[in-house]
């Protein structure tokens, strides 16, 4: 009997551990993929025909971003593109459970066709050290020129270093020695709208009707149920506010439709930027160097010739 109880206990413990492991894997995956996966699941291309990056559909506030990189690169060369997402690292955002926490950052980098994430064996130790423990992925398996990352801790990675490999027109017939645009989208903090159109708890909530607030019920797990006596039809409307936003109204107050019931807890935002890069022809560079060298030599010979002429003139005057 005792052996049977021990067996049952071990069986239950094994099941419990398995469930906990699965929950950990699922929640970890959903958090780590939260930023890119929303866009990846809903949009074939992260940049619309208007030039707008689709992340702006969920991250409504506008914030600055910046990108730094070389003005020109040679073919088949690894270079770094530095994405800067500045914000006050002391700020806290509303998390999904309504509590306050640190902000994460994420970014999407849209490179010209042919440019791609550098393979690990081509990344120099200097660039690898600047990258830290960042993990990049392609927006689509067949879209190697579009790279996404995030969310990652903003306090540690307000600057993201992307290792990029330039194409070689000698082997890639689609690549040409031209000037190309690079597009960037970067965000800090959570979004306000989910891809299905529903609101997150990181945004302002407004009244759905005009009337008097007859009751405010605080839920056990956080958030509020706000009952409004509708003055237009005499009925009642119940507005739900999730945990996170702070109420701005009180019981007995007269409110109007679309009047904010809460503050706007969002402290993050999304921004777009762009840059240009030239895929430089090595022969053109060599030609330019030869031209500059010839100009310098010509100047030297001209100076020497002038001095020689002055000496001849001086000798003739002495005669």
From Swiss-Prot:
Any one cellular-component term (Gene Ontology): chloroplast thylakoid membrane
Cofactor descriptive note: Binds 1 heme group covalently.
Membrane-spanning residues: 285-304
A UniProt-annotated Pfam family: Apocytochr_F_C
Main location per the UniProt record: plastid
Keyword Methyltransferase among record annotations: no
Cofactors: heme
GO MF annotation terms: electron transfer activity; heme binding; iron ion binding
Membrane-related topology note: Single-pass membrane protein
Domain of life: Eukaryota
Keyword annotations from UniProtKB, A to Z: Chloroplast, Electron transport, Heme, Iron, Membrane, Metal-binding, Photosynthesis, Plastid, Signal, Thylakoid, Transmembrane, Transmembrane helix, Transport
Localization of this protein: Plastid, Chloroplast thylakoid membrane
A Gene Ontology biological process term: photosynthesis
Family: Belongs to the cytochrome f family.
Function comment: Component of the cytochrome b6-f complex, which mediates electron transfer between photosystem II (PSII) and photosystem I (PSI), cyclic electron flow around PSI, and state transitions.
Subunit-structure text: The 4 large subunits of the cytochrome b6-f complex are cytochrome b6, subunit IV (17 kDa polypeptide, petD), cytochrome f and the Rieske protein, while the 4 small subunits are PetG, PetL, PetM and PetN. The complex functions as a dimer.
Protein name according to UniProt: Cytochrome f
Source organism phylogeny: Eukaryota, Viridiplantae, Streptophyta, Embryophyta, Tracheophyta
Originating gene: petA
């Amino acid at each position: 009997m005792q052996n049977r109880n021990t067996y049952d206990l071990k069986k239950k413990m094994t099941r419990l551990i398995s469930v906990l492991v699965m929950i950990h894997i699922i929640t970890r995956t959903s958090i780590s993929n939260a930023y890119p996966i929303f866009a990846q699941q809903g949009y074939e291309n992260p940049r619309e025909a208007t030039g707008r990056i689709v992340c702006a559909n969920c991250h409504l506030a506008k914030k600055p971003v910046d990108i730094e990189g070389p003005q020109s690169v040679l073919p088949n060369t690894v270079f770094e593109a530095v994405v800067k997402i500045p914000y006050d690292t002391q700020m806290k955002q509303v998390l999904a459970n309504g509590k306050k926490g640190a902000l994460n950052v994420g970014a999407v980098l849209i490179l010209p066709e042919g440019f791609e994430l550098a393979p690990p064996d081509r990344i120099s130790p200097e660039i690898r050290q600047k990258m830290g423990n960042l993990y990049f992925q392609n927006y689509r398996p067949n879209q190697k020129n579009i790279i996404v990352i995030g969310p990652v801790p903003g306090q540690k990675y307000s600057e993201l270093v992307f290792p990029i490999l330039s194409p070689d027109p000698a082997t890639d017939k689609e690549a040409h020695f031209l000037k190309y645009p690079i597009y960037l989208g970067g965000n800090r903090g959570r979004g306000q709208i989910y891809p299905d159109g529903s609101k997150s708890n990181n945004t302002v909530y407004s009244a759905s009707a005009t009337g008097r607030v007859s009751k405010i019920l605080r839920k056990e797990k956080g958030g509020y149920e706000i009952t409004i006596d509708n003055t237009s039809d005499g009925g009642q409307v119940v507005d739900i506010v999730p945990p996170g936003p702070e109420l701005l109204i009180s019981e007995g107050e007269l409110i109007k439709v679309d009047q904010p019931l809460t503050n706007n807890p969002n402290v993050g935002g999304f921004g777009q930027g762009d840059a240009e890069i030239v895929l430089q022809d090595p022969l053109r560079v060599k030609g330019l160097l030869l031209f500059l060298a010839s100009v310098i030599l010509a100047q030297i010979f001209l100076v020497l010739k002038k001095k020689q002429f002055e000496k001849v003139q001086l000798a003739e005057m002495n005669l």
